Amino acid sequence: MDLRVLNPDSEGIGEVAARGKTVMSHYLDDPELTAETIVDGWLLTGDLGRFDSSGHLQLFGRKKNMIVTDGGKNIYPEDIETVFDGLPVKEYCVFAANYIWPAKALGDEMLLLLLRLDQGQEFDEALKQEVVARNRRLPDFKRVGGCVIWDKDFPRTAAMKVKRVALAEEIRKTLSRAAIVEL
């Protein structure tokens, strides 16, 4: 199998593409999706990555999850989420506020940490301070500006990945921007 990184940015990160005898050639009865996914014989995986100096592929996240800041920097929610690993909550994930609640005037994008607390747990001052302390480990442009408390389990795929689109839609229908607890 051959792999390459398409349209790399200044840090060498781009979309991973694959081709080979074991890579799919098309979607059955879906020429439009095939045309979007297979380009010049290369399968566009939707994963973002780069090759390191040893030739190993490093993955950074999914293209559809990437957030572009006002300053033009690319942020991968998965990168930010690793800083919050071990946070004493049931589950969490990072979103751009404007992705959940589209704003008419873009600018000053706020990143949010969506928290699913354990049963009976509250977002108290101790938990807030732990979030703030972990947040300080991130460069300024990657810091979350607030938290949103969510009372339902996150929808997941069979592979246990968060269904971000479905979760954002559910939040949009249920909560407003007023639910953001600023840090």
Model-derived features: positions:
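AMP-binding/adenylate-forming catalytic core of the ANL superfamily
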Residues: 20, 25-26, 48-140
